[in-house]
Structures are given as C-alpha cells and as structure tokens.
Curated annotation (Swiss-Prot):
NAD-dependent protein deacetylase, deacylase and mono-ADP-ribosyltransferase that plays an essential role in DNA damage repair, telomere maintenance, metabolic homeostasis, inflammation, tumorigenesis and aging. Displays protein-lysine deacetylase or defatty-acylase (demyristoylase and depalmitoylase) activity, depending on the context. Acts as a key histone deacetylase by catalyzing deacetylation of histone H3 at 'Lys-9', 'Lys-18' and 'Lys-56' (H3K9ac, H3K18ac and H3K56ac, respectively), suppressing target gene expression of several transcription factors, including NF-kappa-B. It catalyses: N(6)-acetyl-L-lysyl-[protein] + NAD(+) + H2O = 2''-O-acetyl-ADP-D-ribose + nicotinamide + L-lysyl-[protein]; N(6)-tetradecanoyl-L-lysyl-[protein] + NAD(+) + H2O = 2''-O-tetradecanoyl-ADP-D-ribose + nicotinamide + L-lysyl-[protein]; N(6)-hexadecanoyl-L-lysyl-[protein] + NAD(+) + H2O = 2''-O-hexadecanoyl-ADP-D-ribose + nicotinamide + L-lysyl-[protein]; L-lysyl-[protein] + NAD(+) = N(6)-(ADP-D-ribosyl)-L-lysyl-[protein] + nicotinamide + H(+). The lineage of its organism: Eukaryota, Metazoa, Chordata, Craniata, Vertebrata. The modification Phosphothreonine is found at T294. It comes from Homo sapiens (Human). Pfam families: SIR2. Changing A89S: Found in non-small cell lung cancer; somatic mutation; reduced histone deacetylase activity; does not affect the protein-lysine demyristoylase activity. Its main location: nucleus. Acetylated at Lys-33. Deacetylation at Lys-33 by SIRT1 promotes homomultimerization and binding to double-strand breaks (DSBs) sites. Changing K33Q: Mimics acetylation, leading to impaired ability to recognize and bind double-strand breaks (DSBs) sites. This is NAD-dependent protein deacylase sirtuin-6. InterPro entries: DHS-like_NAD/FAD-binding_dom, NAD-dep_sirtuin_deacylases, Sirtuin, Ssirtuin_cat_dom. Residues 287-296 have a biased composition (Pro residues). Zn(2+) binds at C141, C144, C166, C177. The gene is SIRT6.
Length: 355
C-alpha cells in the first residue's frame, strides 16, 4: 500500500503543500470543459499524459497530499486509511481509458510518478511508459540492466538488493548473467532513471498537448515536464481536484474526479473503456487500431471568455520540432518549493509523488 511505501522512504520534513481544499466544477461547466478536452485530443498530433497518485484513489490506494492523503494525515497526527494492497488493487477507469487511447493512436506517450504498478498491470505498453519514481513490482539487474516484472511487490525500496540474481544469458550456451537484482523504487535523494527521464523529456518536448491527471505537480523534475510542451508552443490541460503548482500555465483546468472526466472524454470521442481481465504485461505496443469516426464535437461557445481560468482552444498546433536527442542528466527528487537549479536536481523528499 502507499502507506507502507511512504513509511519506507527516508525521513524528510518538506513534503510540499498538503491538504489543500478541493474544487469541483459545476456539472454544466464540467461538461463544457470535457467537450473542450475532447476537441484538443482529437485535433492534436502528439498527446502526452502525465499521471499522479490521484488516478489510483478509486482503486483504494490513498494519495499523498489530498484531504485524506498519507502525508496530509501524517501532518495532522492521524493514521492514514487504506482499503487494499498493491497486489490486489485493480486498475481504474482512468487506467483502462489510457490503454484504449494508446491502442487507437490518440496517446503518444505516458509519464507517471506512480509506483503502484497499475499502468503496467493494466496492459499499457512499457515502451510507451516512463515510470519516473519506480515500480513496486519491478526489479532490475545492476549488471546488464534487464528488468523483471513480478506478480508481487519485490520487497525492498531505495534501489536495494532484493536477494535474487539475473538469469539472462547473453547468448545460447553461455552462463547466466547472475548480476544482483535491485528494486526500482527511488528514495528522496536518488537520481531518476536515465532511460525513463530521457524518454519523458523528449516526449514532453515534442508533444503539442500535455494532459496531467491527478497530480499537484509539486515534485521536480517530474512536475515540470508538462511545461516543456508549453515552451515549444503546445497546450497544457490540468485535471485535478486541488490547485496545482502550474495552474497559471494551463490552457484548460478541469476540477473533477479523474474517472468521471475520463469516462466522459471517452464517450465524446466515441470510444469504449475496455474491461480489465487480470494483470497483463505488454513490453511493446501493438499495431494501432483504426481510429473511430470523427466525433460530433459540440460547437464552441461564441463567448471568448475564460472558463474558470482556462483559455479556449485556438487553432490546431503544429507538431513541435524533434528534440535534438541529447539526454538530460539524471536529476534527483527535489523540494517542491526550491527554485530550479542549473545542475541536475536531486529527487528531494518533497518529490516522491508515488501513487
């Protein structure tokens, strides 16, 4: 559970702003905003989603900074509540909607701060997923970097040895690698994984639309990745019940339960949310399915006024230029309030926004 995950991290006082009040858009306003989101998704050529702990609360895994989040309750001297374990948690409607959006080619890449493993267990392809803070079900060989996805949590945290050895042989007839396997869960001071960070950074830079779901965007560098889309002329949509660090940069802000927002979005796009039939690990994306017919999106309102601070969508953005291919140095989890350093940031305690 996220409770055990949080307890396993090193002590750290600055965990960001916790327990901020939740905001709910009125039903009519929520509907207008989701229609606008559907237009943006349909008209964009490279859509990247960024997910945080808020997308897993419906599965029984508590978040961290919400009204009843792990760190919010900790600040109040109360014990957090939990309803499930990582092994028994089921992917939510949001998890499965993201699977389908990728299948039909409407989702280019997925960046997650969550460690609960629900994206992988939902069947989302791992080659289109960056898990910046690790995965409770994954261990990696310290020697050859082969990763193993397990059926149960690996049992350690902080990139520690799990007690198992790598069984991969480089060629037929050769002896197994036998490198030491380590968990992939970061502690506050650990550097983000190079591969995942490089992929997330490149995808965010090349996106013409970034959508954040269930994250307060307080942890750097993960929380700043959506801004790379804005800097390259793309659009940013934030879906969260609480205020986020980057609200002022958003073209559209939606305050509603993420499952409700994603369910409405899929309906407007003419897509079904697939049922989950058990854990399924997909290493590489399958050939995309045909896109559904062009949805009959509601016409925009004539008024150019902002919707609760959001900017109405303009003409379709041209795809951003390709990233030059340089890989950023592995930053570390830093405090959410500290200014962005010029050197690779550290994953400081306020950063772990696990699921």
């Amino acid at each position: 559970m996220s409770v055990n995950y949080a307890a396993g991290l090193s002590p750290y006082a600055d965990k960001g702003k916790c327990g901020l009040p939740e905001i709910f858009d009125p039903p009519e306003e929520l509907e207008r905003k989701v229609w606008e989101l559907a237009r943006l998704v349909w008209q964009s050529s490279s859509v990247v989603f960024h997910t945080g702990a808020g997308i897993s609360t419906a599965s029984g895994i508590p978040d961290f900074r919400g009204p009843h989040g792990v760190w919010t309750m900790e600040e109040r001297g109360l014990a957090p509540k939990f309803d499930t374990t990582f092994e028994s948690a089921r992917p939510t409607q949001t998890h499965m909607a993201l699977v389908q959006l990728e299948r039909v080619g409407l989702l280019r890449f997925l960046v997650s701060q969550n460690v609960d493993g629900l994206h992988v267990r939902s069947g989302f392809p791992r080659d289109k997923l960056a898990e910046l803070h690790g995965n409770m079900f994954v261990e990696e060989c310290a020697k050859c970097k082969t990763q193993y996805v397990r059926d149960t949590v690996v049992g350690t945290m902080g990139l520690k040895a799990t007690g198992r050895l790598c069984t991969v042989a480089k060629a037929r007839g050769l002896r197994a690698c036998r490198g030491e396997l380590r968990d992939t869960i970061l502690d506050w001071e650990d550097s983000l994984p190079d591969r995942d960070l490089a992929l997330a950074d490149e995808a965010s830079r090349n996106a013409d639309l970034s959508i954040t779901l269930g994250t307060s965007l307080q942890i750097r560098p993960s929380g700043n990745l959506p801004l790379a889309t804005k800097r390259r002329g793309g659009r940013l949509v934030i879906v969260n019940l609480q205020p986020t660090k980057h609200d002022r940069h958003a073209d559209l802000r939606i305050h509603g339960y993420v499952d409700e927002v994603m369910t409405r979005l899929m309906k407007h796009l003419g897509l079904e949310i697939p049922a989950w039939d058990g854990p399924r690990v997909l290493e590489r994306a399958l050939p995309p399915l045909p896109r559904p017919p062009t949805p009959k999106l509601e016409p925009k309102e004539e008024s150019p006024t902002r919707i609760n601070g959001s900017i109405p969508a303009g003409p379709k953005q041209e795809p951003c230029a390709q990233h030059n291919g340089s890989e950023p140095a592995s930053p570390k989890r830093e405090r959410p309030t500290s200014p962005a350093p010029h050197r690779p940031p550290k994953r400081v305690k306020a950063k772990a926004v696990p699921s």
